[in-house]
């Protein structure tokens, strides 16, 4: 299929060429950039709506500022695709999120135009402030610009950074990309005029002179003068909050109108004092009708037909783990009115949108605020409710102190459904669920489970609902289940007890999580080679099933632990127990298979697990290496690379 015609964009491989264009050509460039973005993402999938919303802003920023000397930091990075196209990566834009291709987020190792990597929200202002201070210490005159969405402004970290920037009076530019119009809409020509006026040198010079005069007044009159000036501008702009944090506020302005953006950005660029916040209002999905009409459905997309907007979705062999969690929690909530659900701005991603439809008064979306979500859930638990605080593994890292201090130390029965456990594929290392088993199983009294299939997940939801003795978690991966039969309602599992799935005598494979299917496939291959193999679904990393592990250690020559997590998790706990119990003193051959001690780059999950040695082939190789043989009894094959 032929690509769209983009004659002007073809002449702009890098920002220096963009800066050479006359301003009259920039609207055409923006339209061609938008067309190229739509076409590229239609072939790869990825984050579409956010990028479409910042096309004009991206063009304006690279036209006004001297990148890469001047630093542009994109919060989260979902919106950075237009930036990548303009910064020397257009020839690879159709490799987005593919193995060996461009990252779906900003990445320092990928380009000098990406000064700071991102994928989690609300980090841009802190990073930008650090860069601005470093620039000042070095005697540099560079501009530092942090672009942050209004959604990311729900996280406390953004305000902590702004408060610090205001106190330091740092030379930092923050662009608030308000794409939900959640703060204030622009008011047409008057808004644009005021933004241009108050961002200019003349206004700011007069303002500084007035401040100097006011400083000679008694303090109570100084305060009144300052408040009068702030509230006079806030009457038009709504910027009082940001002024209180020490920022000079400009806006709101239309983020799709280059005639509005360019003069304001130039004025701010040419002003050398203090932190500035520019409030820009944009529309997610701008310029592509299907995305404008359904912004939520076009935030992250599969490959799609550009003409119809229809996304290609492969047929599912089984319901997704996320859906199974959501429907299972609904079933438990029908039997227990104390069950409530908490999400940190991810109701659809965690399956709690389904719960919210069934029980709208029992679900709480606290915004991008994982720390608050965890302690909010702890407060609910302290009053006898049963909160299920559903958070992706990678985002639970943001609330770990609250897990320790507010939940675990007080032994409060907060339930933690942990979605996106293990490798997540195209989103890469920033979103991989690698560490939760290790950091939760280290906590005294914390029950840590992992579902091996969708039926086990249903059992674990029921088990967590019934468990009131302290905090409990259960992890499960992204994607579809394996197609096992599902009970209408889960059963309560005995805490700390695993299950034997297949009996053998020579080799024992002890699986924690959904690698169970690969263990069963490996057992078939090992059996065909004359090695009778036991396969066990551990279910629990804490408490461990000590009796079962003792039996496996005493009755088998080889014991292999398999998990979808980093070093320091399930396998480490098993090895600690084996050593303490003296079970390593009899010559047992023990191997622990984990994710490698590197940040694996993005790719297809199956290929990534194979690279990690966590597929059938890797498990078989590990067993034969432990026995110093291969399938034919020859010299052992090399073991998988473990960084």
Swiss-Prot record:
GO biological-process terms attached to the record: 1-deoxy-D-xylulose 5-phosphate biosynthetic process; glyceraldehyde-3-phosphate metabolic process; terpenoid biosynthetic process; thiamine biosynthetic process
Residues at which Mg(2+) binds: 150, 179
Keyword list, A-Z: Isoprene biosynthesis, Magnesium, Metal-binding, Thiamine biosynthesis, Thiamine pyrophosphate, Transferase
Protein residues bound to thiamine diphosphate: 78, 119-121, 151-152, 179, 288, 370
Gene3D superfamilies xref list: 3.40.50.920, 3.40.50.970
Metabolic or biological pathway, per its Swiss-Prot or TrEMBL entry: Metabolic intermediate biosynthesis; 1-deoxy-D-xylulose 5-phosphate biosynthesis; 1-deoxy-D-xylulose 5-phosphate from D-glyceraldehyde 3-phosphate and pyruvate: step 1/1
MF annotations from Gene Ontology: 1-deoxy-D-xylulose-5-phosphate synthase activity; magnesium ion binding; thiamine pyrophosphate binding
Superkingdom of source: Bacteria
Keyword hit for Magnesium: yes
Coiled-coil segments: none
Top EC class, one word: transferase
Catalytic activity: D-glyceraldehyde 3-phosphate + pyruvate + H(+) = 1-deoxy-D-xylulose 5-phosphate + CO2
Cofactor note: Binds 1 Mg(2+) ion per subunit. Binds 1 thiamine pyrophosphate per subunit.
EC number(s) stated in the UniProt entry for this protein: 2.2.1.7
Pfam families per record: DXP_synthase_N (PF13292), Transket_pyr (PF02779), Transketolase_C (PF02780)
Transmembrane segments: none
Stored CDD domains: TPP_DXS, TPP_PYR_DXS_TK_like
Cofactor(s) listed in the protein's UniProt record: Mg(2+); thiamine diphosphate
Family per similarity comment: Belongs to the transketolase family. DXPS subfamily.
Cross-referenced NCBIfam families: dxs (TIGR00204), PRK05444.2-2 (NF003933)
Cross-referenced PANTHER family: 1-D-DEOXYXYLULOSE 5-PHOSPHATE SYNTHASE-RELATED (PTHR43322), 1-DEOXY-D-XYLULOSE-5-PHOSPHATE SYNTHASE, CHLOROPLASTIC (PTHR43322:SF5)
Subunit structure: Homodimer.
The protein's role, per its UniProt record: Catalyzes the acyloin condensation reaction between C atoms 2 and 3 of pyruvate and glyceraldehyde 3-phosphate to yield 1-deoxy-D-xylulose-5-phosphate (DXP).
Protein name: 1-deoxy-D-xylulose-5-phosphate synthase
């Amino acid at each position: 299929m032929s690509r769209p015609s983009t004659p002007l964009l073809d002449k702009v491989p890098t920002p220096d060429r963009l800066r050479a264009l006359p301003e009259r050509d920039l609207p055409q460039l923006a339209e061609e950039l938008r067309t190229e973005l739509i076409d590229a993402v239609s072939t790869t999938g990825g984050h579409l709506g956010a990028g479409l919303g910042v096309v004009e802003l991206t063009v304006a920023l690279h036209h006004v500022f001297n990148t890469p000397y001047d630093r542009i930091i994109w919060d989260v990075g979902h919106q950075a695709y237009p930036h990548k196209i303009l910064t020397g990566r257009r020839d690879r834009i159709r490799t987005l999120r593919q193995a060996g291709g461009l990252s779906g987020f900003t990445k320092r190792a990928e380009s000098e135009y990406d000064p700071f990597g991102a994928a989690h929200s609300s980090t841009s202002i802190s990073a930008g402030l650090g860069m601005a201070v470093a620039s000042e210490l070095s005697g540099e005159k560079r501009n530092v610009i942090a672009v942050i969405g209004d959604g990311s402004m729900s996280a406390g970290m953004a305000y902590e950074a702004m408060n610090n920037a205001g106190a330091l009076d740092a030379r930092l530019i923050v662009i608030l990309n308000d794409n939900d119009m959640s703060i204030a809409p622009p008011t047409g020509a008057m808004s644009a005029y005021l933004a241009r006026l108050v961002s200019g040198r003349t206004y700011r010079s007069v303002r500084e002179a007035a401040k100097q005069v006011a400083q000679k007044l008694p303090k109570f009159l100084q305060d009144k003068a300052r408040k009068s000036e702030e509230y006079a501008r806030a009457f038009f702009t709504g910027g009082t909050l940001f002024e209180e944090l020490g920022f000079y506020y400009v806006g709101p302005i239309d983020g799709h109108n280059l005639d509005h953006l360019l003069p304001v950005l130039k004025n701010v660029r040419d002003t050398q004092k203090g932190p500035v916040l520019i409030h820009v209002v944009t529309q997610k999905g701008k310029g592509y009708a299907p995305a404008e009409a359904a912004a939520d459905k076009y935030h992250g997309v599969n490959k799609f037909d550009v003409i119809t907007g229809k996304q290609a979705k492969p047929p599912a062999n089984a319901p997704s783990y996320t859906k199974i969690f959501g429907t299972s929690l609904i079933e438990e909530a029908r039997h227990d009115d104390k069950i409530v659900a908490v999400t940190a701005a991810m109701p659809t991603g965690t399956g709690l949108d389904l719960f919210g439809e069934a029980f709208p008064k029992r679900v709480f979306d606290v915004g991008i605020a994982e720390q608050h979500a965890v302690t909010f859930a702890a407060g609910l638990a302290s009053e006898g409710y049963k909160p299920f605080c559903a958070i992706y593994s990678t985002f639970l890292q943001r609330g770990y102190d609250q897990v320790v201090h507010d939940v675990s130390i007080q032994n409060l029965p907060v339930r933690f459904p942990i979605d996106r456990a293990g490798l997540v594929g195209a989103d890469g290392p920033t979103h991989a669920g690698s560490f939760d088993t290790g950091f939760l199983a280290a906590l005294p009294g914390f029950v840590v489970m992992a579902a091996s299939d969708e039926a086990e997940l249903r059992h674990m939801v029921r088990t967590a609902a019934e468990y009131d003795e302290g905090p409990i978690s259960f992890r499960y991966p992204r994607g579809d289940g394996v197609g096992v039969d599902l009970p209408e309602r889960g059963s309560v599992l005995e805490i700390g007890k695993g299950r034997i799935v297949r009996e053998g005598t020579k080799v024992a494979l002890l699986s924690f999580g959904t690698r169970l299917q690969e263990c069963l496939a490996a057992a078939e291959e090992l059996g065909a080679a004359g090695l009778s193999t036991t396969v066990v679904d551990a279910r629990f990393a804490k408490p461990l099933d000590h009796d079962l592990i003792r039996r496996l250690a005493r009755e088998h020559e080889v014991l292999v632990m398999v998990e979808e997590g980093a070093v320091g998790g399930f396998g480490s706990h098993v090895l600690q127990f084996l050593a303490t119990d003296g079970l390593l003193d009899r010559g047992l051959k023990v191997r622990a298979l984990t994710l490698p001690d590197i940040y694996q780059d993005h790719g297809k999950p199956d290929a990534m697990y194979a690279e990690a040695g966590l597929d059938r082939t890797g498990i078989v190789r590990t067993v034969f290496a432990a026995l110093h043989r291969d399938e034919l009894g020859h010299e052992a094959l090399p073991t998988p690379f473990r960084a």
